[in-house]
Amino acid sequence: MRLSYLTALTVSTLIVNANIVEIVEGMPYVEVEANGKTYKIERVQKPDTYLTNTFALTSRPSPPFFIEPFLVTEGIETFGELEVLDFISKKKGVFIDARLANWFSKSAIPTAINMPFKLFLSDTPEREKALKVLGAEYTKNGTWNFTSAKTVLLYCNGAWCGQSPTAINALVALGYPKSKMKYYRGGMQSWQLLGLTTIVPEVKK
């Protein structure tokens, strides 16, 4: 994965191809690769665009939809959009969509893999498989060894959604190193409010 910037272009080409809505100055888009595909993450180029889907809602019933704290737990770093782009473009770890599959199948951030938060809540073969994907080892004495665990970045629907915080807290309880976990609090809502690219994942049946 790599960050892609506008480089030396002719003035005429620049006029034709320039993004009028950039991510940051000099960065019109980011290209990322996953599963043999290249995705171009950029912002919607129409400045008068606004959300019309479920993420346009300002309020949801509580419980269960309370506002989550900025720090999901002490010792775990909270990311914004630029940090997410840096993480996925430089392949710094595993990017996890912690939402239930029905949410993930509708729309997701490019390169994310779906590991629903419920996977980590009980001792099941599915949880064991997920933890091994993340680099954990199950020891002979019945505990998990996270020495080789991968760095993970988790997200869900937004600051009002508890799915990724629930997954993070479950991983902490299992002994997953806090230093190897990151939390994108803004999630799908903030991502879409900024007009960033989403995809409809190819869900394996």
Whereabouts are the PLM-identified features?
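Sec-dependent signal peptide recognition
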Residues: 2-9
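Hydrophobic h-region of N-terminal signal peptides that target proteins for export
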Residues: 9-18
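Flexible, polar/low-complexity N-terminal or interdomain linker segments that lie immediately upstream
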Residues: 17-106
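Positively charged, proline/Ser/Thr-rich regional signature most characteristic
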Residues: 72-150, 201
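Solvent-exposed loop/turn segments at secondary-structure junctions
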Residues: 100-104, 119-121, 158-162, 187-191
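Short, solvent-exposed loop/turn and secondary-structure capping segments
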Residues: 106-110, 127, 164-168, 194-195
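Catalytic cysteine-centered active loop of the rhodanese-like fold, especially the PTP/DSP P-loop
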Residues: 135-189
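Active-site neighborhoods of enzymes that stabilize oxyanions during catalysis
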Residues: 194-205
